[in-house]
Amino acid sequence: MSKKCVVVAGGTGGHIFPGIAVADYLKQQGWQVSWIGTPDRMEATVVPKHNIDINFINVKGVRGNGIKRLIKAPFMVLNAILQARKVLKSEKPDVVLAMGGYVTGPTGIAAKSLGIPLVIHEQNAIAGMSNKWLAKFANRVLAAFPSAFATGQAELVGNPVRESVANIAVREVSSPINILVVGGSLGAQVLNTTLPAAFAELGNTNAISVWHQTGKGHLGSVEAAYKSHKFSTENTKVAEFIDDIDTAYGWADIVICRSGALTVSEIATAGKMAVFVPFPHAVDDHQTANAQYLVVANGALLMPQGQFNQQSIVALLSPYLAKPSLIKEMAANAKQQAILDATASVAMHCEQVTNKRA
């Protein structure tokens, strides 16, 4: 009889897509897999597209959402725990794998109360509130970055990323230098408004090509900015969203982007030089901590959003464009920090805790 895993993750792609990667891997190994999420967030539409059955519980974030929700929080969480217990009693999993998001707290508690082994995985360099609590009683605590938990509390396994990212061929840096700009699916206005002028100044003394993801609703203004700075369509590609990010990574010599956990792990896995511009309003400033994992290894550059302007980006990139071997060196350093077997490692830990239960 095959084993069964319930994956718990929700809210953002940074939690959901690593969970899907592990779910797909477990299914290939003969496991049955289902999911617990919330009905009003990304997982509700994304998970079913991957042929994974999903059950829903009702829970919302408490932190930073006002006094009314804080007062109601104990009742909401208790109700969510009861809903999760009902789902788990029906699903009868051998293990629960919690990958982050508000949904993991109540479901992790429900798993513990039912004696179901619990494995948690933290994608960010600073653990979220739910995982900090669940780590106190989880059967196995896994982390993508060494700084997420206290020394000795977690197993370092990396972030599960798509296998296709690891297969991206090493590009020989040559003229023109290819610069990829990715601000997330919604874009990042600081990148959209600053970089066309900065690239124009850099392009006066260096041959560069640009592929810029603007995010929804910003295509026209960014295209106009590049045209105003005399960029031709031959060396500039602007899109609201890049569907094939693997091709974009393969094309790029330098990536300018936010530093969400999955992005940092993908950059390392692809072996690319990055300039990280952390989202300044991330909880606990975890995007800066994520970026530091590569920065301290001389595998990436960091530019705080408050310092991000035309002059600073020109000063930052000019030495690398003038000496492309520095780009190659930084990309190689990033690749050395990648943990390439993260998906298999997470699956292995799920297997191990179920074996101990048998």
UniProtKB/Swiss-Prot annotation:
Subcellular location: Cell inner membrane
Official protein name in the record: UDP-N-acetylglucosamine--N-acetylmuramyl-(pentapeptide) pyrophosphoryl-undecaprenol N-acetylglucosamine transferase
Protein family membership: Belongs to the glycosyltransferase 28 family. MurG subfamily.
InterPro entries tied to this protein: GlcNAc_MurG, Glyco_trans_28_C, GlycoTrans_28_N
Pfam families: Glyco_tran_28_C, Glyco_transf_28
Annotated organism of origin: Pseudoalteromonas translucida (strain TAC 125)
This protein's record includes keyword Amino-acid biosynthesis: no
Domain of life, source organism: Bacteria
Gene3D superfamilies hit by this protein: Glycogen Phosphorylase B
Purpose: Cell wall formation. Catalyzes the transfer of a GlcNAc subunit on undecaprenyl-pyrophosphoryl-MurNAc-pentapeptide (lipid intermediate I) to form undecaprenyl-pyrophosphoryl-MurNAc-(pentapeptide)GlcNAc (lipid intermediate II).
Molecular function in Gene Ontology: UDP-N-acetyl-D-glucosamine:N-acetylmuramoyl-L-alanyl-D-glutamyl-meso-2,6-diaminopimelyl-D-alanyl-D-alanine-diphosphoundecaprenol 4-beta-N-acetylglucosaminlytransferase activity; undecaprenyldiphospho-muramoylpentapeptide beta-N-acetylglucosaminyltransferase activity
HAMAP family listed in its UniProt record: MurG
S-S bridge residues: none
Catalytic activity field: di-trans,octa-cis-undecaprenyl diphospho-N-acetyl-alpha-D-muramoyl-L-alanyl-D-glutamyl-meso-2,6-diaminopimeloyl-D-alanyl-D-alanine + UDP-N-acetyl-alpha-D-glucosamine = di-trans,octa-cis-undecaprenyl diphospho-[N-acetyl-alpha-D-glucosaminyl-(1->4)]-N-acetyl-alpha-D-muramoyl-L-alanyl-D-glutamyl-meso-2,6-diaminopimeloyl-D-alanyl-D-alanine + UDP + H(+)
Topology in the lipid bilayer: Peripheral membrane protein
Single GO BP term: regulation of cell shape
